[in-house]
Amino acid sequence: MNPLALSLILTTLLAGTLITMMSSHWLTAWMGLEMNMLTMIPILMKTTNPRSTEAATKYFMTQATASMMLMMALTINLMYSGQWSIMKMTNPVASNVALMALMTKLGSAPFHFWVPEVTQGVELTSGMILLTWQKLAPLSLLYQMATYTNTNLIYLSGLLSILIGGWGGLNQTQLRKILAYSSISHMGWMLIILPFNPTLTLLNLAIYILLTLSIFMILANTLTTSMSSLTLMWNKTPAMTIMLMTTLLSLGGLPPLSGFTPKWLMIHELTKNNSIIMPLTMAIMTLLNMYFYMRLIYYSSLTILPSTNNMKMTWQFTSTKHTMMLPTLITLSNMLLPLTPMISMLE
């Protein structure tokens, strides 16, 4: 892609997200979401092939439908209340339709079907932006709507997302699809805690983005996209394999890694509000995610193919893009748990 065009696209993407996050008026927030959607399409089609074209088309159709639903909800609310303020959506029908539209943009269940297909059809860097940056704008609107949304709808979507995110990833062999289902599952945790403590939703989002960025950067550096290529990682880059293994365990929420921090705090918050069955159900369903993370670790580090000296030397001739961000991201991905008491004091 032309560097000038790429810089313009990324600047517009950044501007669209910031406009939505800083807006308290529905119309400007909607404009920011549309800027986000339109600039994401050329990013998805960075490499022109039938799969990326199909993925971009699916993304556009889904996001355009969600945008129409959101505009319909805003129109209904304007007719009944005469307000454009995000904090004053008093009509229950408008509130529910807007909630479903934002859930569709986030890719939470039962509006999740586009996420694995779109992620699988694009490059690793495009998939990384789709599963991290594109969550910020819709979730910032849900954060502002947390006081008056239909909590039953949020709980239902959250539990379904955790279940489908774990169940859907069990039989996958493509790493991008596995990370897409992981995104759906983490979105379920964020939605469920939103009515209780929106600050914990932001904490979970920050750590999820940190972990997902780390994994995508490792996969992009090692040119790994499937389980079959994952089995060659130990022969090529043992250090990267160890980093991938610990980051996957952290993404699964295994103590004493960073990914355990938000789950620990969210379960504590739910039990503090006399909700016992829900966190227990969430923790049990998350074991499905842990299973396919462990399967990835098994393929990458415990299954070593027979190799020759020539194969062991291939990493020296592989053109990989080294980044200074990766060591910092890996360190944060695995060592934030000791900061949990300080984080809990800031709530």
From Swiss-Prot:
Membrane topology type: Multi-pass membrane protein
Say which enzyme class the record assigns: translocase
Positions of disulphide bridges: none
Localization, per the record, is: Mitochondrion inner membrane
GO terms (molecular function) for this protein are: NADH dehydrogenase (ubiquinone) activity
Q: Name the Gene Ontology biological process terms.
A: mitochondrial electron transport, NADH to ubiquinone; mitochondrial respiratory chain complex I assembly
Family to which this protein belongs: Belongs to the complex I subunit 2 family.
- What PANTHER family does the entry give? NADH-UBIQUINONE OXIDOREDUCTASE CHAIN 2 (PTHR46552:SF1)
Quote the subunit structure annotation: Core subunit of respiratory chain NADH dehydrogenase (Complex I) which is composed of 45 different subunits. Interacts with TMEM242.
Query: According to its UniProt record, where is this protein mainly located?
Result: mitochondrion
Catalytic activities: a ubiquinone + NADH + 5 H(+)(in) = a ubiquinol + NAD(+) + 4 H(+)(out)
Transmembrane feature ranges = 3-23, 25-45, 59-79, 93-115, 150-170, 178-198, 200-220, 240-260, 274-294, 326-346
Q: Which UniProt keywords apply?
A: Electron transport, Extinct organism protein, Membrane, Mitochondrion, Mitochondrion inner membrane, NAD, Respiratory chain, Translocase, Transmembrane, Transmembrane helix, Transport, Ubiquinone
Q: What is this protein called?
A: NADH-ubiquinone oxidoreductase chain 2
UniProt cross-references to Pfam families, sorted A to Z: NADH_dehy_S2_C, Proton_antipo_M
Q: Choose one Gene Ontology CC annotation of this protein and give it.
A: mitochondrial inner membrane
Function description: Core subunit of the mitochondrial membrane respiratory chain NADH dehydrogenase (Complex I) which catalyzes electron transfer from NADH through the respiratory chain, using ubiquinone as an electron acceptor. Essential for the catalytic activity and assembly of complex I.
**Protein's organism:** Mammuthus primigenius (Siberian woolly mammoth)
InterPro entries named in the record: Complex_I_Subunit_2, NADH_DH_su2_C, NADH_UbQ_OxRdtase_chain2, ND/Mrp_TM
Q: Does the keyword Signal apply?
A: no
EC number, as in UniProt = 7.1.1.2
Q: Does the keyword Transmembrane apply?
A: yes
The gene designation is MT-ND2
